[in-house]
Amino acid sequence: MGLLATSLRPSRAVSLAADTSPPPAECDIAVVGAGIVGLATARELAARHPDARIAVLEREPRLAAHQTTHSSGVIHAGIYYRPGSLKARLCVSGARELYVYCEERGIPARRSGKVIVATRPSELPRLEELARRAEANGVQGARLLDAGELREVEPHVHGLAALHSPATGVVDFGRVAAALAAAARAGGATIHGGCPVLGSTPTDRGLELRHARGKTRARAAVFCAGAWSDRLAVAA
């Protein structure tokens, strides 16, 4: 079984440079990691708690340096996940909200659609199961195609059948990350690059983060470290 979705060329014009200033010795909330999850978290915290001192600690000198800008850039519609699961609900609602977010901020996001193609008879039951999941999850416009309909949607693909998801799209997540960072900063958050967190220690008022540039005491911390999360968990 295969899939096809087009992509957008990543923008080279968006600045993802992090601040070079050292992190504060104290803050109310620390966010560890300035990928798209950490930046979205900082933006939301700054909006909900405008008086809080929020500091984002990022190991690299630039934002979104790892998974965020090295993925396929696909906005997933929610086909694959177990119906009723948190991941399914968040994927469907998150895709819808992301399109709106990008449109409001002038970030190019293309609803290119996706076809998941069955090329062998043995793959047809799995394709039908994905179609059932898509319907159960409320994926907009998803439908099964026979071979003729598949050729109409994508003439360069050959298969026995396909699941078409017109709600699937692509976006430059570097641009999304830059917009989130700008919103977080506008809300009062600070973002500090070149500051890998090495570990944390609970205190009577929260926790103390040890990082390459010293220590930061925070009342609370949100760890959004992606592939580094397991190492931070061990070091906690």
What label would you give each PLM region?
Residues 46-70:
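Glycine-rich FAD pyrophosphate-binding loop
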Residues 1-29, 44-53:
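Extreme N-terminal leader/targeting segments of oxidoreductases
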Residues 73-153, 159:
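Dinucleotide-binding Rossmann-like beta1-alpha1 core, especially the glycine-rich loop
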